[in-house]
């Protein structure tokens, strides 16, 4: 089965959030078959920094939805959006 790489933009709910801790929480929340391939940051506004997390998932029905739901359920996450998707 082929795999898909997706860049997910994770917005914390406060500029005071520890991004390293948030990244660890996101990693722990991943569903089976998904893995984080890298994380970058993006300054948004007013001191708020988003995490740009590259996730590798199987190319099956549902795509990144399980990862989006898992990330959205993590404490201190305001929103999750898909920025890019591509086949590997």
UniProtKB/Swiss-Prot annotation:
InterPro entries: eEF-1beta-like_sf (IPR036219), EF1B_bsu/dsu_GNE (IPR014038), Transl_elong_EF1B/ribsomal_bS6 (IPR014717), Transl_elong_EF1B_B_arc (IPR004542). It holds the Pfam family EF1_GNE. The keyword Protein biosynthesis applies. GO terms for molecular function: translation elongation factor activity. Keywords: Elongation factor, Protein biosynthesis. Coiled coil: none annotated. This is Elongation factor 1-beta. The lineage of its organism: Archaea, Methanobacteriati, Methanobacteriota, Stenosarchaea group, Halobacteria.
């Amino acid at each position: 089965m082929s795999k898909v790489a997706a860049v997910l933009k994770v917005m914390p709910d406060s500029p005071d959030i520890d991004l390293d801790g948030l990244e660890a929480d996101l990693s722990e929340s991943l569903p089976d078959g998904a893995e984080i391939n890298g994380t970058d940051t993006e300054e948004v506004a007013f001191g708020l920094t988003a995490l740009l997390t590259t996730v590798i998932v199987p190319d099956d029905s549902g795509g990144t939805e399980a990862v989006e739901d898992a990330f959205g359920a993590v404490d201190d996450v305001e929103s999750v959006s898909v920025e890019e998707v591509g086949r590997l």
